[in-house]
Amino acid sequence: MSNRNNRRPILIPIAGVFLALAVASHLASPSRPSRSTSAIYAETNQIKVVEEGDMCLPNTVLASLQAAIPTRQSVVGGDVVPIRSVEDSYYSLHSVSVDPMNNRVVMTDANRGGILFYDITSGNKTSAVTDPLWHIRGPATGMMFVAGVATDPRRREVFTVDNDIGDRMMVFPYDVDGNVKPKRVLSVPHGAWGLALNLQRDEIAISIEHPNIVAVFKRDAMGLEAPKRVIHGPHAGLEDPHGIVFDAAADEILVANHGNWAPLDREEAGEGDETIPGRFDPPSITSYPGEAVGDAKPTRTIQGSQTHLNWPMGMSLDALHDEIVVANYGDNSVLVFHRADNGNVAPVRVIRGEQTGILGPMGVAIDTQNDELWVTNYRDHSAVVFSRTATGNIAPKRIVRNAPPGTPAVGFGNPGAIAYDSKRKEILVPN
């Protein structure tokens, strides 16, 4: 068959898309000088020299297309080591719980996904790193971005929840180490942050950030078991809840709120003139009866400029001295209030300043037996221990370090995306 009737399609892969090009062939002419050009064979990504009259492309177009085709050497796949990475190889301490009955302090590591057990006397004033007694971590644990923690001294159990991605509460026994499976796993609403046990009620309360709820479960709930009751609604005062305590003696639930609220769904948002908009309010600490359910209004609210609340995180209750302690992440401080405070009230004590060693406080815990206050630093690879009544710009009694002093903390908080600023040549990582 002549070249006039011999036409072949050529497929060219560019950026993973196959573009079919059909180009008509030229008539063979003996008076025309013979020229050669190139064709791309899609099966091999190779260039082959062909004579005029065969299927061909202009050389300028061909060169551009050839440059866009990845070579076999440039294709990456399999178990490949990255060129470089930004990561924190040390623990980032999140929440803390003290158990004087068993002489234990338990902390969660949000960075590498684990639970750390320390002796209650751990720490020193040197630059030495303090190794944990036990460290639960590994794929079998199911832990991811670990947040709140609570301990049951009688049953020697530790409870923790995954924030943002795991949507699970996991329960482990004391004194286990390594890559171990949890005793129990409970599915919880998305965005769980804080935990609070009430052993008298045999219940555990969980603060859920995004839908602005507090869910109360049986202590031993597991699987897909539903909560016994839920506090939620436009009048409940729950606005991005984080820290939570369950006051067994007063039968109250206390919650630290960042101040952001939005309707959970269309039904709650309403329609037309009855639409309820989202809002940004000042941070607060709200209190509820232990049996509160639904859109229950708080019985008390600590809120206002005098409170100095600024991104309140973890909370701890000192029932013996009628005080509540709050980790105030926004200005690297710890605030202490009377348990029954209400309104725009100033804290009883404030620990803040360069000497305190507080940097990105995420969790707090009161040890009334040893008269001490524990604070976990999310941005400093450390936990600092103060006298319970410490105030002002005061140095801690002890420091529990998991990295040498001055080691920078990457500060990732479950990054969900990445972008590159070509003007400033910076990598942007929203958390």
Functional labels for PLM-detected ranges:
Residues S2-G16:
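N-terminal Sec-pathway targeting helices
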Residues D119-S127, V171-G178, V216-L224, Y288-D295, ...:
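Short loop/turn segments immediately following beta-strands, especially the blade-tip
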Residues V81-E87, P132-P139, K181-L186, P227-P234, ...:
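A short beta-strand motif characteristic of beta-propeller blades
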Residues F280-P289:
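Beta-propeller blade signature
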Residues E87-N102, P139-R155, V188-E203, P234-A249, ...:
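Beta-rich, blade/repeat-based domains predominating
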Residues I12-H26:
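Hydrophobic membrane-insertion alpha-helices, especially the h-region
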Residues N59, S89, V98-P100, M107-R112, ...:
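Conserved beta-strand positions in repeat-built beta-propeller and related beta-rich domains
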Residues P33-D79, K125-T126, D295:
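Blade/loop signatures of beta-propeller domains
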